[in-house]
């Protein structure tokens, strides 16, 4: 099984965001900065989603060999994570 290209993953994520009435979703981390490696995970931060658990469940259904992490911006308390998110966000939805 091949690793799904990030462009295809983002296309699927966009459809899931529409379905879940997400206000905004950003990509951050190595995929946003262009430094991803074959073992990199995909990091997303969500702004405004009524049912975050459903969004996470839907995202986990994407058949990729990469790990997908999703963070609710309003729930983040880790200053280093917040700094990383604010430094190089790439809005995808």
What are these regions (language model features)?
Residues 1-26, 32-38, 47-93:
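Catalytic core of pol beta-like nucleotidyltransferases
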